[in-house]
C-alpha cells in the first residue's frame, strides 16, 4: 500500500476579537500609493488570494445555508502553496490554478516570494495587534525528504521540521496537537482526532489573531435581544449597542448594509447585512472589486448600531471543498508528490482546517480609551445585525484576506 501524507490546516482568530474585513484590493491598479510600491511581493498575490477566498466561500455556502461558516483563506492557501513545492505535473497545475494563479501570467517564483513576504509581514511585532502564523512539518523518522523541498519550505514558508513516529499514532497525534495548541495560545485543542498508521508526513499551518476595537462598545449597553436565524427560528443573543459615528452605508448593488470597523493596529473588519431574502444575492454578487471600493470610499455617519456578541468556530474537512475547486489529484493515487521524496509514492490523506471567532465589546483586552463624538440632534437611523450576515477581515499592509465567514446562528459554537 502506498504511503500517504497526512496534512492538517489550522486557523485561529483569537479570543475576544472581532473578525471581518475587506478582501484584497487589486495590486495592479494604476496610481498605486507609495505604500503599495513598498510591498510589491505580497501585493502581487493579494488579488489571487481574494478570488480564492470568495471561491472557497461560495463552495461552502452552496453545501449548507443553515450553518455558520468561518475560515482563513490565507492559512489554507499558505499550506497549499508550500505543498506545491513538492508536486509535479497535473498535481502541481491543479493546486496553482485552484489557488487562482495562472503560471503563464505569473512566475512561480513571484508567487512563493509573495507568500514569503506575507509571512514576514504578518509575523512582525505589533504592540496593538497580535497576529502570528506558523508552519510545521512533521516527518516520519523513516522518511527521507529531498533536500530541495526541505530547504524551500524552510526558507520560503519558515516551516519548522519535527521528527515524528507515525507508527505510534497516539504519540504523533499528541505531538501535532501540542504544536497547534501552543501556537494558538490554547484556543485550538485536539485539531487532529485520528491519524492513519500509513501517514508519513503532516503539514500544519495556523494563524492566530487578537485585536482591540478602535471604538469599543460599552459593556453596560449589551442586552438580550432576538436574532432571526430564518423565518421560523429565533434565538436570544447578547446584543451590543452603541450610538455614534460609524463607517456604515447601504449598498444597493449587494442589497446590504455595509459596516466597516477598525482594530487598533493594521486591520479592518467589514460586515455585510443583506436585506430580507437577499442573502444568496449577496453571496452571488459580492466580488473583490466591490470590497476594495468599500475600503477606498470610507465615510462616517451617525447610527444606532446593534451587533451580537459571538463565539463561533468552523471546522472542515478540506478534501471535498478543494475537490470542488479542481484540486483532485493530490488526494488520489494520481498524486505526483515526487518533489518531496523519492521513497514510496505519497498522497494527501487528510486536510483539516479549524477557525475560531470571538467578538465582544472591547476586543481582546479591555480598552481604556474614552471616545467623545459630535452627534447630530436628530435621532440616528438604527442598523441591527439581527439576522444572518457575512464577515471578512483584511490586514492592510499585505492587502490579504485573513478571515471570511457567515454568521447564521450566533448561539452555535
Curated annotation (Swiss-Prot):
It is found in: Secreted. Glycans are attached at residues 65, 102, 266. It comes from the Eukaryota. This is Alpha-1-antitrypsin-like protein GS55-MS. The keyword Secreted applies. Residues 368-387 are annotated as: RCL. GO terms for molecular function: serine-type endopeptidase inhibitor activity. GO terms for cellular component: extracellular space. Gene3D superfamilies: Alpha-1-antitrypsin, domain 1, Antithrombin, subunit I, domain 2, Serpins superfamily. InterPro entries: Serpin_CS (IPR023795), Serpin_dom (IPR023796), Serpin_fam (IPR000215), Serpin_sf (IPR036186), Serpin_sf_1 (IPR042178), Serpin_sf_2 (IPR042185). It comes from Ictidomys tridecemlineatus. Pfam families: Serpin. The reactive center loop (RCL) extends out from the body of the protein and directs binding to the target protease. The protease cleaves the serpin at the reactive site within the RCL, establishing a covalent linkage between the serpin reactive site and the active site of the protease. The resulting inactive serpin-protease complex is highly stable. Its main location: secreted. Keywords: Glycoprotein, Protease inhibitor, Secreted, Serine protease inhibitor, Signal. Belongs to the serpin family. Residues 1-24 form the signal peptide.
